[in-house]
Regions:
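Basic, Lys/Arg-enriched alpha-helical interface segments
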Residues: 1-69, 78-82, 88-118
Length: 118
């Protein structure tokens, strides 16, 4: 099944995940791009260690580059759309709950504006 990757956009027009990616050095952007392509190619079939479920319909795509642990948070919209909400550089431990909560709020906003589950 083909998946389509989209980036969450706030009402004000900012795209937190794209902004995070653009802020990275070129070599990291390239690897993050390949990681997102993998996610688009595999969708629900992607498994650990590449992805993990964080709860409340939020997942993370893990991207390890040298000593850097990038995380891209996303959710599924219907059967074919993956919405990437935000990114972060994880230093240690779990993804902070505040970051997961923000991704969950982005999901609620997306569903409200786009029209619920498809």
């Amino acid at each position: 099944m083909a998946f389509r990757l989209e980036f969450y956009r706030t009402v004000a027009g900012s795209e937190p995940a794209l902004e995070y990616i653009r802020d990275q050095v070129k070599s990291h952007r390239a690897k993050i791009g390949r990681a997102l392509q993998y996610l688009e190619d595999t969708g629900h079939l992607a498994r650990r260690p590449q992805v993990d479920y964080l709860g409340n319909d939020i997942y993370e795509r893990r991207v390890a580059i040298d000593q850097h642990q990038h995380r891209l948070l996303y959710f599924f919209h219907g059967r074919s759309v993956i919405v990437v909400t935000s990114g972060l550089l994880k230093n240690e431990g779990k993804v902070p709950q505040s970051v997961i909560e923000r991704a969950r709020k982005y999901r609620v906003d997306w569903l409200k504006r786009i029209g619920g589950e498809r």
